[in-house]
Amino acid sequence: METSGARTMTAGTFLVALTLVVLVLLLWHLRWVLLVLFGAVVVAVALDVLIVQVQKRTRLKRPQALAAVLGILLFAGGLLGQLLVPELISQFQQLGRDLPQLFSKVSDLLSSEPRLAQLNEALGEGLNLKGLQPLLGFAGGAANSLIQLFLMALLAILLALDPSSHRRMVVAVTPRPARQQMELLLDECRQALGGWLSGMTLSATSVFLLTWGGLLLLKAPLALLSALVCGLLTFVPTIGPTAATLLPTGLALLQSPQLMVSVLVFRLVLQNLEAFLLTPLLLRKTVNLLPTVALTAQLSLGALLGLPGVLLALPLVVVIQVLMQRVVVQQIMDRWA
């Protein structure tokens, strides 16, 4: 009898392990579908924040409020595009002319320092034709990304149009004893993600405007383009602000080393203000992300999924942190006897 029970337990354990392996492989093969779905959830939460604000100030029902939000966003995007796109196109063209000069100047600076000569040779070898051959598939990748963005936007609109139905579906597939906890968990995830998105949007907008104004005062080249890059990369904490500083600093080097130092000091001051004052102030009511956790998530998802993984790493960490606190810590660890 004991042998039969042991065999049954072994067979059951094997089936559970096999099921988990198959599930992990299935999730890995569907990773891009899951990435698009999670991106749609993030965008839907961002739309929901705006929809709630519109409904508080008007008597519009949700479909009309969603249409109003989309109309406002399209109008604002068109207005900003009309004002900024011509200047951005001009600055992109200027950037294309300046980049060869910048690479040449950096190469000359590296060559003048014996200890950096090997780095210069490595960069030169890395920029040859063989190193650029993988870029030949850029057009196909761009088309695939556009399709994914379109599907993400469509899913986000559908989710924002009727979130309660999708919420009921998630609760319905949850075991009955845990349904109330699932409802609370969904509320907390939505609140945390909405707060993070609102705070980061305000932070990115502030960084864009302050960088644009500061670079204009310093008379740095391509101020609008550099400020736009700095603002967008604010959504990628830890890595983004540091990487964004390279563009205005490098372009300033083409004019003079003094201007480069001025731009670098300005960006460092602004980056520290954003990291230690602005972002904590805007995100004080949402989850507190540790820099080590944020950086690890960005590196891990970036290695697995590329740029989309880096962009969605922080929203995913926000949700996972809520899940860890409410499920793992409170439901498992705190009850461990």
Residue ranges and their predicted role:
Residues M260-A337:
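Hydrophobic alpha-helical transmembrane segments of membrane transport and translocation systems
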Residues G12, A142-L253, P257-V265:
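Alpha-helical transmembrane segments and their immediate interhelical loop/hinge regions
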Residues A6, L50-T58, Q64-G71, L79-L151, ...:
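Juxtamembrane membrane-interface segments in integral membrane proteins
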